[in-house]
Amino acid sequence: MARKTNTRKRRVKKNIESGIAHIRSTFNNTIVMITDTHGNALAWSSAGSLGFKGSRKSTPFAAQMAAESAAKSAQEHGLKTLEVTVKGPGSGREAAIRALQAAGLEVTAIKDVTPVPHNGCRPPKRRRV
């Protein structure tokens, strides 16, 4: 029986002009995912995946680095224009949007899609530090 050779599939370079950047900014981390207009992922990055650990993940600088990293790999697919959707209350929201613009991508629209409960679940108790 012939041995199966280990061949990895190469990433196909797609020619996509416009896409959507989904920025999820929590109190602990910032995740930036860039998709095409149908929602298929092109690139993603997060503060934790770039090596930031602990409380450094939640900083605006970490969010900026995550957005730059995702933008760089999305530009390899030919991406030029972006719509941005921002979700969550974290500190890296504005920094990530600015980093996408600084990376050379044209931001056409910014939407805030943070889920707001209509008095659903009881929130966690307040921290006393």
UniProtKB/Swiss-Prot annotation:
Family statement drawn from the similarity comment of this UniProt entry: Belongs to the universal ribosomal protein uS11 family.
Underlying gene: rpsK
Keywords linked to the UniProt accession: Ribonucleoprotein, Ribosomal protein, RNA-binding, rRNA-binding
GO biological process, one term: translation
A Pfam family assignment: Ribosomal_S11
Transmembrane feature ranges: none
Organism: Listeria welshimeri serovar 6b (strain ATCC 35897 / DSM 20650 / CCUG 15529 / CIP 8149 / NCTC 11857 / SLCC 5334 / V8)
Name of the protein described by the UniProt record: Small ribosomal subunit protein uS11
Role this protein plays: Located on the platform of the 30S subunit, it bridges several disparate RNA helices of the 16S rRNA. Forms part of the Shine-Dalgarno cleft in the 70S ribosome.
GO CC list: ribonucleoprotein complex; ribosome
Quaternary structure (record): Part of the 30S ribosomal subunit. Interacts with proteins S7 and S18. Binds to IF-3.
GO function term, MF aspect, one: rRNA binding
